[in-house]
């Protein structure tokens, strides 16, 4: 019963509209059905867990502006290079390599093997699966997988925080910023404070898919990539309560740790408008902690 209550209260804080927390469907039933399986993996976390970013890159043919795509990716990678803890690796998977040198040995480009090439096909998850197969073949170990969109920017202490607090489950970034070009307009995104009446909740996880780190373990007896596969294709606003139902409750990153860039012309839905001006405190926080902005 505690698991169900924890899931419910998680949804009250994180669902954009609170009454959605009362809904229950096939996805929730599926997670509950897998809980016993996820409780059967007992390998302890290693002394040197790997942190691997998976970056699916849109094709040149599908991109609205390939030059902008590459510029944004470069900023994303610069934020990784600026991490205070250097123990990470990034795998970029796409049809086309970016138009700049990948001059850090921790960053690898993986040519996407597209068996049914079409310009408009949604191929993000195929690219992620190719990355995972590559990890199976080249990185037999345990650690964390983090899907990072090629236009999002991480706080410089993020990797350090995760590797200082390793656990066998999931990390979630629920606090961060939506940021428009120029760095002055945006929104602070965070869970609803249940002690205050606020109808709409804008969490980072609800807005941005780059919000989750999943533990993996390819050692003998390990859970392999099962946790990632159970969660990654679900709505990213649901990662938190679904992980609870799996019996793998996540760890909240306690500080605003991600910037979700908008209005650059390559990831926007129709009708998105310029967000309001950020407070002076938020602009300073971004300047102090996101070293490439």
Task: Show where each model-derived region lies.
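Short beta-strand-to-loop acidic/aromatic patch adjacent to the donor-nucleotide binding site
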Residues: 139-153
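Short, acidic, metal-binding catalytic loop of nucleotide-sugar glycosyltransferases
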Residues: 69-87
């Amino acid at each position: 019963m505690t698991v169900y209550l924890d899931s419910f209260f998680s949804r009250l804080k994180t669902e954009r509209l609170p009454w959605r927390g009362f809904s229950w469907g096939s996805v929730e039933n599926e997670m509950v059905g897998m809980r016993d399986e996820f409780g059967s993996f007992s390998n302890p976390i290693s002394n040197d867990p790997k942190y691997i970013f998976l970056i699916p890159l849109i094709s040149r043919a599908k991109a609205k502006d390939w030059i902008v795509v590459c510029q944004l990716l470069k900023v994303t990678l610069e934020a990784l290079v600026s991490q205070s803890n250097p123990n990470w690796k990034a795998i970029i998977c796409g049809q086309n390599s970016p138009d700049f040198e990948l001059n850090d040995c921790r960053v690898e480009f993986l040519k996407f093997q597209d068996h049914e090439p079409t310009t408009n096909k949604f191929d993000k998850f195929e690219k992620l699966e190719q990355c995972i197969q590559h990890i199976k073949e080249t990185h037999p170990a345990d650690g964390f997988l983090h899907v990072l969109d090629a236009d999002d920017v991480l706080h410089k202490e993020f990797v350090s925080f995760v590797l200082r607090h390793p656990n066998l489950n999931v990390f979630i970034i629920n606090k961060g910023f939506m940021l428009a070009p120029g760095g002055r307009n945006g929104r602070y995104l965070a869970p609803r404070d249940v002690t205050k009446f606020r109808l709409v909740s804008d969490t980072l996880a609800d807005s941005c898919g780059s919000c989750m780190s999943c533990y993996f373990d390819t050692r003998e007896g390990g859970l392999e990539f099962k946790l990632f596969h159970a969660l990654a294709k679900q709505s990213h606003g649901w990662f938190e309560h679904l992980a609870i139902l799996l019996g793998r409750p996540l760890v909240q990153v306690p500080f605003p740790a991600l910037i979700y860039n908008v209005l650059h012309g390559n990831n926007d839905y129709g009708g998105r408008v310029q967000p309001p001006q950020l407070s002076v405190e938020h602009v300073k926080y971004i300047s102090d902690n996101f070293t490439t902005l």
